[in-house]
Curated annotation (Swiss-Prot):
Stretches for region Disordered: 69-101, 680-702
Phosphoserine, modified sites: 487
Key words of the record: Acetylation, ATP-binding, Isopeptide bond, Kinase, Nucleotide-binding, Nucleus, Phosphoprotein, RNA-binding, rRNA processing, Transferase, Ubl conjugation
Annotated organism of origin: Homo sapiens (Human)
Enzyme Commission no: 2.7.1.78
Record protein name field: Polynucleotide 5'-hydroxyl-kinase NOL9
Length: 702
C-alpha cells in the first residue's frame, strides 16, 4: 500500500505539459510519436515536406499519403520471416494498371540476378552486360570465356590466354569493361548454343545453366581466379607490405557477392575509385594509335613529358596496352631515374614490350635490351653523364616498332633545359605534354619554342650557322665519334599534343619523397623475388641462399655517387646493392685486388645483386643475384650507387637470433654520400612553403 500511494503521489506531480501532450491525439506519420517541427532535424523536415507535396499532388489527405508512402517503403524492404500479404486481384475494369506493373517488375528483374557467382574455391564467374564495368581492388587472373572485355586499355577476347591483373592500393583501381563486339547475324538461341559450347571446358552444368538464364546478346562472361605468385608472396612476407595487394576493411553487410570475391582475393570498389580518363587523354591515345598503325612516315617516336604526379606513367601503360591490341611489340625508352617502369631504380634502359602491363611497375619487371646503371635516382650535378648514357642507350633503337620515351617530372629551371636537350637528341615525331591545375607552370614545347631556346648543352636554331639544326657543337661537347660528327643528326620538328588531366593524387611536396621511396623499394623487392623458387614451393630467406664467389681480380669496382677513399672502398661495397656490368677493358691481367676504376664507365648493365659478404682471407666477393650463370661469366665490373637495399630486407631476417647483421644505430650522416646511401633522394630544388598568415580584418593606425 505504501508503494502504491507513493506511485500515485509521483503521478500527480507530473507537469501540466506532459499530461496535455499525452491526452491530445497523435498524428501518425510513422511508427514514432509526433514531435514538434522545431525539434525535427533538417532531414526530418525535408522528409515531412516531401510527403506533404506528394500527398498534395495525388489529391489525398496527407495522412493517407503518408500511409501510402510507408506501404511503398515496406514493399521495397527485403522479405523477413513474416510473410507479406497476398495482393488482391486486379479488377477487370482497370486493365491499364497491368502494363505498369509489368514494366516495374521487368525493370527490377535484372537487380535480382547476382552479378558474381562462385564456381569453386578461389573462382568466380562475372557476367557483364555490354558497356558495363566492374571496378575492383586486389589481384586476380582474368579469363574471357565469352565476348570481349578491356582492362587498362588492353582487349581480352574469348580464346585468348588468361591475364594477371594487379589492382593494388598504391595506384588507381582497375576496371573490367565489356566491349561491343561484332557478331554474325544469328538468333538468340543460336548465340546461346555457341556460348554453352565455349563454357563446357570451364564450368559445370549448374554454372552453365545460370549463365544461360542470365544471358543477353553482346554480354561478356569472365572467369576470375585466385592469383598467387612468388613476387606477391615475397613482398607480402615483409611487415607492412601485405596491405598493398589485399586490404581488409570492415563490411557493414556481408553478401554472397562479397564472399565470392573474397575467395578470389579481390573486392568490388566504387566506380569513382577507378581510373578516369579525360577527353583530351582519349583523343591523344586515339591519334597516337592511328599514327603508329598507319606506318606512313615510319615508326613514330613519342616523347611524354610533364610535371610530377600528372599521370605520365599511367598514360604510358595505357598507350602500350592500346598499341599491343594492333601491333606485336612496342619499344620503350626509360629516361626517368627515380621512377622506372620495368627495371630497378637508377637505370636508363631500352626495352621491347610484347605483353600488356596490367599493374604498377613492381608487378611487371622485364629484361631490357640495353641498360646502363646510373646509380642515383636523380641526375643532379651530373647532367652531362646523363645525356651521354641516354645517347648510348638510344643508339640501340632499331626503328622497327613505335618508341615511347618516358621523361622525368623535373620541368623547371635546369630540368626544362635538359628536356630541350633530350628533344633535340632523340628527335621525336610527337611530344605529349601533360598539364593540370596543381602542376607547375611549363611552357608549350612547340617546335618553334624548342628551336628558339638554348638547352644545357645545345644552342638554339637561330645561333646555328645552317637553317637546319645540326648537332655538331653538341657532338664536340659530348665527345662523339668521328663518323658521327661527319653525319650529324638533323632536327626535323615534332607535333605537340597537349593533354589536360585532373589527376587527383594525395601526394604533397612533404610526403612525395617518402611515397616515391616506397615505390623504389617495392621494385627492388620485386627484383629480389626472382631468387625465390617457383610456386608452390615455400619462400626461402635471402640469407639462406647460396651466393656466387667472385675473386677480387675478376671484377673492377667503382662508387658512382660519391668519392670514396681507396682504403674505404670495401666498406662501401659490403652489404650494398651493386650493378653487374660489362666493360670493354680487360681486367684479367691484375693479380691482386681490389681493382678500382678512376672514372665511372658507360657500359652495359646485365643485372643487379647484393654483396652479402667479403672474404678478405680468400679475397672473394659473395654476390647474391638472380642473373643466369651464362651471363655472369661476362660480368667484369661492379658499380655501387646511391640506390640502397630496402631496410626491411636487413631488419626482418627470419631465423636470426641476437644482433642482426648489417644493422646499426651508429651511423655517421656527415660522411660523403651517407644521406644518399640510406635512400634519401636529394630534390632538384628545395621546396619552400610560405608560412600561413591569418587574414587581418583590421590594421592598427599609428
Amino acid at each position: 500500500m505504501a508503494d502504491s500511494g507513493l506511485l500515485l503521489k509521483r503521478g500527480s506531480c507530473r507537469s501540466t505539459w506532459l499530461r496535455v501532450r499525452k491526452a491530445r491525439p497523435q498524428l501518425i506519420l510513422s511508427r514514432r510519436p509526433r514531435r514538434r517541427l522545431g525539434s525535427l532535424r533538417w532531414c526530418g523536415r525535408r522528409r515531412l515536406r516531401w510527403r506533404l507535396l506528394q500527398a498534395q499532388a495525388s489529391g489525398v489527405d496527407w495522412r493517407e499519403g503518408a500511409r501510402q508512402v510507408s506501404r511503398a517503403a515496406a514493399a521495397r524492404r527485403p522479405n523477413t520471416a513474416t510473410p507479406s500479404p497476398i495482393p488482391s486481384p486486379t479488377p477487370a475494369s482497370e486493365p491499364e494498371s497491368e502494363p505498369e506493373l509489368e514494366s516495374a517488375s521487368s525493370c527490377h528483374r535484372p537487380l535480382l540476378i547476382p552479378p558474381v557467382r562462385p564456381v569453386g574455391p578461389g573462382r568466380a564467374l562475372l557476367l557483364l552486360p555490354v558497356e558495363q564495368g566492374f571496378t575492383f581492388s586486389g589481384i586476380c587472373r582474368v579469363t574471357c570465356l565469352y565476348g570481349q572485355v578491356q582492362v587498362f586499355g588492353f582487349t581480352i577476347s574469348q580464346g585468348q590466354p588468361a591475364q594477371d591483373i594487379f589492382s593494388v592500393y598504391t595506384h588507381s583501381c582497375l576496371s573490367i569493361h565489356a566491349l561491343h563486339y561484332s557478331q554474325p547475324e544469328k538468333s538468340k538461341k543460336e548465340l546461346k548454343r555457341e556460348a554453352r559450347n565455349l563454357l563446357k571446358s570451364h564450368l559445370n552444368l549448374d554454372d552453365r545453366r545460370w549463365s544461360m538464364q542470365n544471358f543477353s546478346p553482346q554480354c561478356s562472361i569472365v572467369l576470375l581466379e585466385h592469383l598467387k605468385t612468388a613476387t606477391v608472396n615475397f613482398i607480402t612476407s615483409y611487415p607492412g607490405s601485405s596491405y598493398i595487394f589485399v586490404q581488409e576493411s570492415p563490411t557493414p553487410q556481408i553478401k554472397p557477392e562479397y564472399l565470392a570475391l573474397r575467395s578470389v582475393g579481390i573486392r568490388r570498389e566504387k566506380k569513382r575509385k577507378g581510373l578516369q580518363l579525360t577527353e583530351s587523354t582519349l583523343s591523344a591515345l586515339e591519334e597516337l594509335v592511328n599514327v603508329s598503325c598507319e606506318e606512313v612516315d615510319g615508326c613514330p617516336v613519342i616523347l611524354v613529358c610533364g610535371s610530377q604526379d600528372v599521370g605520365k606513367s599511367t598514360f604510358n601503360r595505357y598507350l602500350i596496352n592500346h598499341l599491343l591490341n594492333s601491333l606485336p611489340c612496342v619499344d620503350y625508352l626509360e629516361c626517368d631515374l627515380g621512377q622506372t617502369e620495368f627495371t630497378p631504380p637508377g637505370c636508363i634502359s631500352l626495352l621491347n614490350i610484347t605483353e600488356p602491363v596490367l599493374g604498377p611497375p613492381f608487378t611487371h619487371l622485364r629484361t631490357p635490351q640495353k641498360m646502363v646503371y646510373y646509380g642515383k635516382p636523380s641526375c643532379k650535378n651530373n647532367y652531362e653523364n646523363y645525356i651521354d648514357i641516354v645517347k648510348y642507350v638510344f643508339s640501340a633503337y632499331k626503328r622497327e616498332s613505335p618508341l615511347i620515351v618516358n621523361t622525368m617530372g623535373w620541368v623547371s629551371d635546369q630540368g626544362l633545359l635538359l628536356l630541350i636537350d633530350l628533344i633535340r637528341l632523340l628527335s621525336p615525331s610527337h611530344v605529349v605534354q601533360f598539364r593540370s591545375d596543381h602542376s607547375k607552370y611549363m611552357p608549350d614545347l612547340t617546335p618553334q619554342y624548342v628551336d628558339d631556346m638554348d638547352g644545357l648543352y645545345t644552342k638554339s636554331k637561330t645561333k646555328m650557322r645552317n637553317r637546319r639544326f645540326r648537332l655538331a657543337a653538341f657532338a664536340d661537347a659530348l665527345e662523339f665519334a668521328d663518323e658521327e660528327k661527319e653525319s650529324p643528326v638533323e632536327f626535323t620538328g615534332h607535333k605537340l599534343i597537349g593533354v589536360y588531366t585532373d589527376f587527383a593524387f594525395r601526394i604533397t611536396p612533404r610526403n612525395r619523397e617518402s611515397h616515391n621511396k616506397i615505390l623504389r623499394d617495392l621494385s627492388i623487392l620485386s627484383y629480389l623475388s626472382q631468387l625465390q623458387p617457383p610456386m608452390p614451393k615455400p619462400l626461402s630467406p635471402l640469407h639462406s641462399l647460396t651466393p656466387y664467389q667472385v675473386p677480387f681480380n675478376a671484377v673492377a669496382l667503382r662508387i658512382t655517387h660519391s668519392d670514396v677513399a681507396p682504403t674505404h672502398i670495401l666498406y662501401a661495397v659490403n652489404a650494398s646493392w651493386v650493378g653487374l656490368c660489362k666493360i670493354q677493358d680487360d681486367v684479367r691481367g691484375y693479380t691482386n685486388g681490389p681493382i678500382l676504376l678512376a672514372q665511372t664507365p658507360i657500359c652495359d648493365c646485365l643485372g643487379f645483386g647484393i654483396c652479402r659478404g667479403i672474404d678478405m682471407e680468400k679475397r672473394l666477393y659473395h654476390i647474391l643475384t638472380p642473373v643466369p650463370p651464362e651471363e655472369l661469366r661476362t660480368v667484369n665490373c661492379l658499380l655501387v650507387g646511391a640506390i640502397a637495399i630496402p631496410h626491411c630486407v636487413l631488419k626482418c631476417q627470419r631465423g636470426i637470433e641476437g644482433t642482426v647483421p648489417y644493422v646499426t644505430t651508429d651511423y655517421n650522416f656527415k660522411l660523403p654520400g651517407a644521406s644518399e646511401k640510406i635512400g634519401a633522394r636529394e630534390p632538384e630544388e628545395a621546396h619552400k612553403e610560405k608560412p600561413y598568415r591569418r587574414p587581418k580584418f583590421c590594421r592598427k593606425m599609428k
